[in-house]
Amino acid sequence: MQFKQTLSRLALILLPFSAFSQSTFLPQGDKANILMERLEIKSRSDSFFNYSKTKPFSRRHVVNAVNHYVEQPGVKLSKVDKYNIERLQMNNLEYVPVAEHSKYLSKKKFIRKFYSTPANLFEVHVKDFDLVVNPVIQYTVATESNNNDNVFLNTRGVTARGQIANKIGFFTYLTDNQERAPKYVQDFISMRKAVPGAGYYKPFKAAGGTDYFDARGYFTFNVTKYIDVAFGYDKNFIGNGHRSLLLSDFGNNSLFLKLNTRIWKFNYQNLFMELQNADDRIGDRLIGKKYAAM
């Protein structure tokens, strides 16, 4: 509790000094992450891309980095590159000049009340306020060998992000999930009493199924031109690949305070987290806490 109060107080102390443009982050798995990794390889030593080991990426910095790369003399882009850059800008209009917004509008006027652009269900971009809201819907069914039961994932929810006065950013992600994972994951859940990537769960009516709620959110702001601060409850990732030995998103969400200092070719990150112990004992009691500083 004392650690949580310390993080909250530190975030509140830093907040009044926020006076620079801020940003929310690209979620893990977003297609723009692949674009960034590709352009990092193509640009080689360009310091704008020299930070791919610390995820998630800042949306504002990603858009600025891509624009910086495109403006370089002699740059060659494939049709796929151009398409992905256009999609990146369409998905992040709050960081695109207002004069360019019109070219991303939906061509069918009758759906513009909601899908004003093909990228987002509902979005508002006015002076001192941006808001983007989207549904989260996923339903998959599959089969696997040596298993008579279908595997499935049923996810419904909503995600929203925005910024206020170009100083404070916010993000939230809320979903309700029911799934029956492949057999090897079911074995992991049975042995560890934990669902990969999730926290508290309960058995679902289907044999081997699980039911869990996923709630994430954070605020972002800038202390100085070169220091970004994020405070909230979400996942963080340090390293490369789908998993990382240093810090992966395989576990549950956690309370965190993150300070990211980026200047010239240097990117220095401080991360403070409150974590929960793995615990398979049931009952009406608090789960043990542990803390990390990286």
Model-derived features with residue positions:
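Outer-membrane beta-barrel channel domains
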Residues: 30, 42-53, 58-60, 64-294
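Short N-terminal segments immediately surrounding and downstream of signal-peptide cleavage
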Residues: 23-40
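Bacterial Sec-dependent N-terminal signal peptides
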Residues: 1-24
